[in-house]
């Protein structure tokens, strides 16, 4: 029987404990495991290489994304670093989105300057620019869709197809939607990665990442390197992640419903100069999103019509939206891209990506939607006070 996403998330690892019959899989905190005899190791010998709790959540994540296997890492950035470590060597070219996550941009730019590989940041919605970059025969193409923070959507199937024709490996960062709303491997990607810190865990109490591959041999290679460079996820984070994963589908449903209501509210506000969400017909890639996604998601961003003082007054008027980085938790968060999530980008790079100084990003939580809109109303009221 082919299981649906919600069933996979809830049932993964249940009733697997043959020793005690635990319904919920136990947490295995031991760092090392004894041998049964001389030169007779068990299935696990050291937790950096393999851990029973991590095994369970890796199987769950692989099944959710339709992959051959998964490698859990200790952060989302470790997942990105693992992919570039495995597939890029000096002289190889990485093609990445011009508006990618600020942490990814900083990592790629820094390692390229050290000669680890070359990187080219491209507007992947511009087919001519993308084809020009692919003509240089990159080894790896990274896709983010929807993009961070402007929620631009690109055609994953098309980009992965073009990458394959160019001989490149395609990897999609699916953090903003989760497998509940998008499955890049089914769209032609070779790899998919997540910051598990976000929607997959959903409670802002785990830092982890994952790489999921379509090919079993690639999974083996990724796992080998993850062990070697010491980026595998911990048992405790694996346990919390698996617990959070069980409510992924209902969390995404409520958060997305709240986001759509907030978008409708923000459309009526005079202080909102620009609004970004894939549900909007004018949003870049709206038609693509309707085709390749199972929902428009719970992330949105908007530009305030004003200066820094307007921004400060607006934020000071909020009480339910927490001013913090990250996203995907049950609580609603708001962040200022230029000084927070994308502070690692040079001002000219932010400008080229369309990230203004008054851009705010919202990660919609699962609070009551009417309360969230009332809180935004308080923010706009404060912003209008001189």
What are these model-predicted stretches?
Residues 11, 70-269, 276:
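Conserved PLP-enzyme active-site core in the AAT-like
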Residues 274-360, 364:
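Conserved C-terminal alpha-helix-loop-beta "cap" of PLP-dependent enzymes
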Residues 1-6, 12-14, 52, 274, ...:
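Positively charged, small/polar-rich N-terminal and surface patches that mediate targeting and assembly
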């Amino acid at each position: 029987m082919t299981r649906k996403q919600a069933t996979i998330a809830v049932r993964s690892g249940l009733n697997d404990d043959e020793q005690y019959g635990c319904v919920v899989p136990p947490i295995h905190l031991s760092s090392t495991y004894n041998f049964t005899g001389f030169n007779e190791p068990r299935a696990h010998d050291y937790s950096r290489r393999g851990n029973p709790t991590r095994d369970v959540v890796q199987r769950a994540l692989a099944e959710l994304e339709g992959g051959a296997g998964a490698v859990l890492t200790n952060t989302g950035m470790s997942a990105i670093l693992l992919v570039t470590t495995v597939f890029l060597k000096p002289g190889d070219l990485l093609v990445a989105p011009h508006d990618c996550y600020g942490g990814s941009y900083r990592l790629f730019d820094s390692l390229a300057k050290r000669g680890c590989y070359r990187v080219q940041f491209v507007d992947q919605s511009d087919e001519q620019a993308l084809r020009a970059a692919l003509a240089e025969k990159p080894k790896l193409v990274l896709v983010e869709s929807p993009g961070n923070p402007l929620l631009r959507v690109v055609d994953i199937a098309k980009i992965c197809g073009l990458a394959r024709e160019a001989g490149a490996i395609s990897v999609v960062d699916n953090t903003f939607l989760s497998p509940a709303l998008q499955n890049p491997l089914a769209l032609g990607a070779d790899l998919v990665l997540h910051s598990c810190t976000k929607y997959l865990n959903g409670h802002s109490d785990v830092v982890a990442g994952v790489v999921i591959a379509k090919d079993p041999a690639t999974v083996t290679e990724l796992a080998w390197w993850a062990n070697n460079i010491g980026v595998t996820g911990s048992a405790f984070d694996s346990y919390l992640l698996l617990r959070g994963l069980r409510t992924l589908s209902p969390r995404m449903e409520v958060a997305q419903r709240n986001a759509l209501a907030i978008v409708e509210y923000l459309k009526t506000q005079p202080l909102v100069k620009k609004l970004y969400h894939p549900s909007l017909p004018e949003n870049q890639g709206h038609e693509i999103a309707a085709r390749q996604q199972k929902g428009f998601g719970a992330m949105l961003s908007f530009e305030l019509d004003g200066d820094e003082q307007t921004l400060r007054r607006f934020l000071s008027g909020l009480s339910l939206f927490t001013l913090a980085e990250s996203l995907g938790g049950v609580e609603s968060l708001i962040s200022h891209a230029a000084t927070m999530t994308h502070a690692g980008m040079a001002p000219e790079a932010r400008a080229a990506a369309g990230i203004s100084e008054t851009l705010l990003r919202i990660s919609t939580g699962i609070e009551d939607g009417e309360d969230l809109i009332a809180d935004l109303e308080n923010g706009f009221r404060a912003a209008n006070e001189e």
